[in-house]
Amino acid sequence: MLLRFPQPYDFELSTGRFRDYRSDRATVWHDGALYRVVAGQEVRVSAADGGVEIEPWGEAAAGEIGRLLGLPFDLETFRGGVSDPTLRSIVESLPGLRPTLNPQPFEALVVAITTQQISLHAAASIRGNLVERYGVRHEHAWEFPTRERIRELRPRHFTPLGFSRAKAEYVLELAHSDLEFDALALVDDEEVIAAVTSVRGLGRWTADWFLARHLARPHAWPAGDLGVRKAVSRFYAAGGSLSIEEVRRMSERFAPFENLSAQFLLAGARMAG
């Protein structure tokens, strides 16, 4: 059944990161389609006129896939409101791009932990090992390990998967924490940051990306992310290297669309090579 998207929407362009990181086992690109397990059932997502085709259809599948593919973003208002000429040029060059999200909060934070201080490809690889070992396999994709499943583990279970001792402990701290994910969706950005950073191993960078890539908060600006710093430096510092604080101050330039601005700057940097 068709899940409609505001047009223009380019499925191939918007899902490029899933093809780039094929070691991701929770959201799998295979033979022109995405596969993800939703509520215990594998769902196939493919391009269709006016949106995407979801098989099998269900309310849970439509909700999760819509969030995965960035439906919460108000791109029409963003595209019409971009005033910065450099960013506007990037946005106009990518008319069908809709940034993606991670629809599950626990998974989103584990993803953030795995990407700390290593390349995205290396992070995807060790995360894939975790999902294969402790998730539930379906035909193409694996169901991401639940918080309850991770609580059963010890640091020694993570070492063969490529995790450092510290990252293993951070994932376990998260699993055993008092964070109430549903409640985080209902509070303001500063409260989310305070709650996330109260867990050992989760700092401001992790909180910013959680706001940006899970909650789709419009003002999220992950200045501490190396990719964002490189993208901002590329387009606004003539290839020089801006500091975290310099990048953080630049968020005012893109208000009130900081999150989508960061996503499009990253996309522009990737497209430019």
Ranges and model annotations:
Residues 1-273:
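HhH-family (HhH-GPD) DNA N-glycosylase catalytic core used in base-excision repair
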